Each structure stands twice: as structure tokens, then as C-alpha cells.
Amino acid sequence: MAVGKNKRLTKGKKGVKKKIVDPFTKKDWYDVKAPSMFNIRQIGKTVVTRTAGTKIASDGLKGRVFEVSLADLQNDEIAFRKFKLMCEEVQGRNCLTNFHGMNMTTDKLRSLVKKWQTLIEAAVDVKTTDGYLLRMFCIGFTKRRQNQIKKTAYAKHTQIKAIRKKMVDIITREVSTNDLKEVVNKLIPDSIGKDIEKSCQSIYPLHDVHIRKVKVLKKPKFDIGKLMEMHGEASSHATTTTTDETGTKIDREGFEPPIQDTV
């Protein structure tokens, strides 16, 4: 056998352990900040590989979407609505997010659908005053009239069309006359759904009317000033709001406080 052809002699030792490197030693943690419309500003942390060479850490964070329950954002028990927040800017160790969509949990939607009633849905594309194109989906259900003996509460086709038209008109009116911040303020207590429910009573009584889904189809050109304004940091008291973990409590249209037993 020729010299140098024996591969067994040139092979290294079997079972040599590789040095295990913890991947988290090359990563940094960033705080995720929600806009000032929500009561809880600090919604969590996210991890990213730290800046090395041409790969910048902030570029890996921009565009990340975080899905958070409204219960965590408002510190209450309404947990069936989920808000999507997208990271648009990184300042220091803070990821500043903006509204990117809303959805209802599957279990809540399934629990609404019942027998002996009519399900009515509507969808509409509408533009806000600051240039966001939103696709909004609404859902509602008929209910029995007061003192009704009949078990079923089925609406006629003409009534369904009239209710759907009313849904589209109210959503268009509420969104097209407001900016994104005001629209989110209406989505938090679901005041648009309550308005639709009241307006449709003359056509057919409704219940469980909700904006079940919101998609952001188009966004205007990114403006850092607008984003800072959403986070309450554009005004003169910027130093106080950056460290504040809670948003500002505001009176919202369509919100009714619970009845108190004692004064």
C-alpha cells in the first residue's frame, strides 16, 4: 500500500467534544414600549443579536410585530381582544411601537355563534385623516324582541342588507374623520360596536356587536415626530414621559362606568 493513502492514520480522535458557546452571550435585551393610548406602557422585552460589523441591532428590531392582549395593555379583565404593535423606531434600549392591527380570540368568536339567531357581518376599507388605510371587519347578531314568544330571531334579507349598510356607514364616519390615535381610542372600549347596536334597534334588535378585526393595509411615510407624539414624548415634558410606565387615562366615547352599590 502506498504511503499517505491510509486514511485511518490521518483521522482525528473520535468523541472530541466541541466547545459549547451560549448564543445569548452575543444578544441584547430591549424593552418594548406601547403607545400612550394604553394604560400599561411597558409590555415586555425582546432579544436581538448585538451590533457587529455591518449588521446593526436596530435594523433587526424594526418591523417586529408583537401581539398583546388588551387585558395586559389596560390592566383589566377584557382579554378577548388582541392588539398587534409593530416596532418602528429604536431609542436606546427602548423599542417604540405603533398600532398594526387588532383581532378577537378564536374562543370568543366561537362562543358568540348560537342557534336561532342571524349572524350579520360587514367589511369596509377606510382611510384615516393621517393617511392610514384600514380594513375593518364588523360582526353582530340578532336577538329576540322584548315580550317575544317565538323562539327564533331571524332577520329578513332586506333587514340584513339595511343593518350591513348601517354598519359600513357608521364605521366609515367614525374612522374617516379621525386620526389613527383617535381610532385606537375608540377600539379600546369598542364604542363603534355600541353605536352600531343603538342605531340598528329600529331595524332589528342586535346584541354582541363588535369590531372583530382591523388590518392596516397602507401606512403613510414614516414620521418620527408623529411616532414620538403617539408615545407622549413630543411635548416639553418628554423627560417625564419616557420613564413613565403608564399611559394617560382619558374619557372615551361610549364608555359607561359600572353601577355602584354604595356611594
From Swiss-Prot:
InterPro entries in alphabetical order: Ribosomal_eS1, Ribosomal_eS1_CS, Ribosomal_eS1_euk
GO biological process: translation
Pfam family, one: Ribosomal_S3Ae
Keywords: Cytoplasm, Ribonucleoprotein, Ribosomal protein
Compartments in which it is found: Cytoplasm
Residue ranges with Basic and acidic residues bias: 246-255
Main location: cytoplasm
Keyword Cytoplasm: yes
GO MF term list: structural constituent of ribosome
Compositional bias of kind Low complexity: 235-245
Superkingdom per UniProt: Eukaryota
Keyword Ribosomal protein: yes
Region (Disordered): 233-263
Gene Ontology CC annotations of this record: cytosol; cytosolic small ribosomal subunit
Family: Belongs to the eukaryotic ribosomal protein eS1 family.
Quaternary structure (record): Component of the small ribosomal subunit. Mature ribosomes consist of a small (40S) and a large (60S) subunit. The 40S subunit contains about 33 different proteins and 1 molecule of RNA (18S). The 60S subunit contains about 49 different proteins and 3 molecules of RNA (28S, 5.8S and 5S).
HAMAP family reported in the protein's UniProt record: Ribosomal_eS1_euk
Name this protein carries in UniProt: Small ribosomal subunit protein eS1
Provenance organism: Nematostella vectensis (Starlet sea anemone)
